Amino acid sequence: MLFWGAFLADHAVFGQSTSNSLDSTAALTYWYQPSFVIMHDMAIRNRVWIPEEIKNRSSLFGIRHSRGQGDFKAAQGTDGLIQSQLYTEGKTDWRKTSFWGRFSYDRSAEDSTALRHQSRWNVDAPLYFGSLRKNKYSRETYKLDAGIQRAFFDAKLPISLGIDYRLGSHYSNNDPRGDIKDMNLQFELSVGHNLPTLSYHIAGIWGYGSERVNVGYKNDKYTTNTEDPLYVNWMMNGFGSASERLKEINYNDIIHRKGVGAHILLKPNDRNKIYFNSRYLNEEQSFRRNDNSKQTYLSLNDYKKDIGSIDFLWSRQMHRKRLLRVALQGQIENGQDFNYSYLANNYTYRRHEISFKTQLAVHQYLFEGHAGMYKTEKKDGVSGNQMEFDQVKLGLGLNRTFRLGQSADIIGTIGYTKQWSPSHNLYVSELNTGDFGKQILYQDYLYDTAPRNSWNMSWVWGTHHAKNNWSIQLQMDYQCRGNLVPIDYTLSSVPGKNWFLGKLGVSYIF
């Protein structure tokens, strides 16, 4: 009662600047108040809107430490996570050109992860190595994102360029030892037209990436092991179709990406802004093992995926310091492989999702509601394995800004989300699927269909001087599941009851 009372008590607090200009908004409010964060994140996903929704000459430098612990996880998840992040972001305008950039360095350690050596960026790919033995994984990831826009002909013809670059290294420190290197580079070039109440942009997208995976053993006795099931290495090539792989445990995944995008902004009056963004991407992955042949490699699997997405956001400034935001996002993914062992398509993947979020700001309060529906299908043609499940999410949130004297604020947020699966089905072939594949399929099925309740709470303390501010962030997330659906297979482990994640960060705003 005291906790909710602190949120609902009526006190004078610092809120949005009286100016309608984004650049005059207090820096702490812009970076951490959810009604600004939702606009900021939309502009980062769609770089053509950087001049509209990114605060100029405000930069952020921060460090964050996270710890996660629990046994409610997917088959290839982790029991424990320790992560540290260093990041910086900012935007400036120079000679009629907008420049935005963000850099981050992440270092994490995962405890007790099994069944897949992976970068965690390519989770639906059909080919990977894994074992029943639990590993400790260390990961390092560098990310550099940028956006540039210059408007020509009296600001009527904007040309924008978005760049995303990622470089990662992932390795385990116990047998079987995985060593994974990944990179991704993507460009999006846009040309637009600005009118008094309408702006639109057409974009072309090109990307390239790769993953290099090697698995080995420090202890030589495991290199020819076929007796101890924990140390046997398996190669998955499909959905549950796995075979033992005792030598040449490596592959390269070459990724090519191309697509188009469209971005529209409507400004019917000075109180309303309506953004609509859409994209289509075609992604092609080629899994290869290097050899001494004339071609220099052996093709293992080609995986192609079509991705269509929409990103809608409506912002309305109402009377009496009230503000409404409505966001809608949707995505459709359709993937299928060409398996060179069968010279035919074997694996198919489909994922449809739509999510809705609304925010209503009234003075120092922000009320939020969100909902989402998700449908996933995975099939393996040779074995006959098939998994289908629907997921529904509903949630509520409350945010409040508290004034602490003349130079500091606290921004508090609490939220609750409920998720369940109204429809699901799993078929696993007893004859064509070994224990390794069954452990993955059944554990994931239990995890994805489990009803769950999630609670989150975050607090941000920060100063709001004209320049040079500090903030401290604390976040806690807790998730617990309900009853698991019944299955007719005995697993070595099932998803546990709980998962907890805590984050603590410090940032300097300048």
Placement of each model-derived feature along the sequence:
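N-terminal, post-signal peptide beta-strand-biased segments of exported outer-membrane/organellar beta-barrel
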Residues: 11-111, 125
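Short loop/turn motifs that connect adjacent beta-strands in outer-membrane beta-barrel proteins
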Residues: 17-22, 49-59, 90-101, 150-159, ...
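Transmembrane beta-barrel strand/turn architecture of Gram-negative outer membrane proteins
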Residues: 81-102, 181-208, 315-317, 390-399
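A broadly used, surface-exposed interaction patch
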Residues: 117-151
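Outer membrane beta-barrel transmembrane domains
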Residues: 120-131, 230-509
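Internal, well-ordered domain-core segments that constitute the primary functional module
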Residues: 140-235
